[in-house]
């Protein structure tokens, strides 16, 4: 590493990069939920385990980044010691771009008036500072993506720049007892919302916010109960045969809040990722999971001090942005490059997961009546759950043992709805006490 090729321009301004970033961000008004919903927590030993963050439920290990398996199912490569992962990005000026700035520099040096000189210098500074700004925002974007994934999934995979090909898998320990599927497969019902509210009430918690993907909210607005909810709010008279139009987002969210005393927070955030020179836009929030919260603050943004911050490399210019982002500028040769490097030790940590409730709307989450097998069961003796056949009387008995009211002569539809209304923990208990019938 050598000093920047344009040291005469950046030596005075680079330490003030933090001010430039904030000034440039203001008009854009980028929104970052991780900055609103996480409290910054400093870790003196560069570990997230020993901080004031509540990590009672958190478990972490190292896994392969490129495995096709879902994050939760990837095999463990090593045990994590709680070290904060290094997150960062680089912006590089190559020879063509360096030559372009050199031409600006020549114009600056040959300018005949102070005004012209000032204008040329500003052009050069803008070009050089933009990369620092991009690195700072890039780290924010990664933090936002990590946060949205963590909050919706309960599990996060963060690539560590110091360990190529592996990533830190953090499982925040979302409770199976607080995770539910939809009662009717593929549809979110009024009863699904009430089901989760009842569980929270039983736990002594009060749900205040529902975070949901825009696409999922659009699906919900089309449901009959959603249309009726808004029609009732508008004091409309209707019957079961009345066609009710799909309500607007604003009307439905207001009616929903009036009905359940829960505010809807719509998530529709995209983040651009770059790999092997290819950019791809991705929405990190899992649209199939609706997350119910009891607090606006859901955890900590744990950060540490980079070794390079206390052991600076000679010739490299450094700037600190938002306390934890270290932005450096330097040049290299063979080939000639001007590099801006942004790095940080940071991890969003979801806390108080006993106050987080999830409605998993994915197709594989809820079961449905197996109509083909039901036709063959002329005596109505069995109920099929997730492809396995059980004695219906046994299923009903176990549902009653879990406190679920089901009639002795309940139809398969009613039994399946009762099974779908269970939390993950209850469903596991139910199936463990049943014996599949050949």
Locate the predicted segments by residue.
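Short linear loop/turn motifs
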Residues: 25-29, 38, 48, 269-274, ...
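Basic helix-extension-helix modules of the SAP/HeH family
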Residues: 372-438
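N-terminal alpha-helical "arm" segments
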Residues: 1-49, 355-367, 436-438
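Assembly/oligomerization interface modules of large self-assembling protein complexes
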Residues: 34-111
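Extended, solvent-exposed, turn-rich assembly/linker loops in the middle of proteins
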Residues: 164-241
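Long, low-complexity, charged/polar intrinsically disordered regions
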Residues: 144, 176, 389-392
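Long, contiguous amphipathic alpha-helices that act as assembly "spine/axial" helices in icosahedral shell
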Residues: 85-174, 200-216, 336-345
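Sequence/fold signature of self-assembling virion shell proteins
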Residues: 227-397, 438
């Amino acid at each position: 590493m050598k000093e920047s090729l344009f040291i005469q321009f950046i030596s005075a301004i680079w330490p003030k990069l933090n001010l430039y970033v904030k000034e440039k961000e203001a008009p854009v008004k980028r929104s970052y939920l991780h900055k609103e919903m996480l409290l910054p927590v400093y870790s003196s030993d560069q570990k997230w385990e020993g901080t004031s963050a509540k990590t009672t439920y958190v478990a972490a290990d190292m896994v392969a980044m490129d495995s096709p398996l879902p994050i939760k199912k990837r095999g463990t490569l090593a045990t994590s010691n709680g070290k904060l992962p290094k997150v960062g990005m680089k912006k590089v000026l190559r020879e063509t771009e360096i030559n372009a700035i050199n031409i600006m520099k020549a114009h600056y040096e040959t300018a005949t008036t102070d005004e012209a000189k000032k204008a040329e210098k500003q052009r050069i500074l803008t070009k050089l500072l933009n990369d620092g700004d991009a690195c700072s925002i890039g780290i924010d974007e990664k933090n936002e993506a990590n946060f949205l994934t963590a909050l919706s999934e309960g599990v996060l995979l963060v690539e560590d720049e110091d360990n190529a090909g592996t990533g830190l898998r953090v499982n925040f320990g979302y409770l199976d007892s607080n995770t539910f599927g939809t009662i009717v497969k593929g549809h979110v019902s009024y009863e699904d919302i009430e089901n989760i509210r009842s569980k929270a009430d039983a736990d002594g918690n009060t749900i205040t916010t529902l975070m949901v993907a825009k696409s999922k909210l659009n699906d919900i607005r089309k449901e009959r109960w959603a249309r009726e909810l808004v029609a009732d709010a508008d004091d409309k008279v209707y019957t079961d045969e009345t066609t009710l139009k799909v309500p607007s987002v604003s009307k439905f969210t207001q009616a929903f809040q009036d009905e359940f005393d829960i505010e809807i927070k719509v998530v529709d955030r995209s983040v651009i990722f770059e790999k092997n020179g290819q950019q791809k836009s991705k929405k990190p929030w899992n649209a199939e999971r609706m997350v119910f919260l009891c607090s606006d603050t859901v955890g900590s943004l744990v950060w540490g001090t980079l070794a390079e911050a206390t052991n600076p490399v000679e010739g490299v210019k450094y700037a600190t942005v938002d306390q934890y982002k270290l932005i450096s500028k330097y040049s290299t040769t063979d080939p000639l490059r001007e590099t801006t490097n942004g790095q940080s030790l940071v991890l969003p940590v979801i806390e108080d997961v006993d106050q987080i409730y999830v409605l998993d709307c994915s197709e594989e989450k809820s079961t449905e009546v197996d109509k083909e097998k039901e036709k063959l069961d002329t005596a109505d003796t069995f109920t099929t759950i997730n492809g396995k056949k059980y004695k219906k009387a046994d299923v009903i008995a176990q549902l009653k043992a879990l406190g679920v009211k089901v009639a002795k002569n309940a139809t398969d539809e009613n039994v399946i709805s009762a099974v779908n209304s269970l939390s993950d923990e209850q469903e596991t208990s139910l199936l463990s006490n049943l014996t599949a019938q050949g």
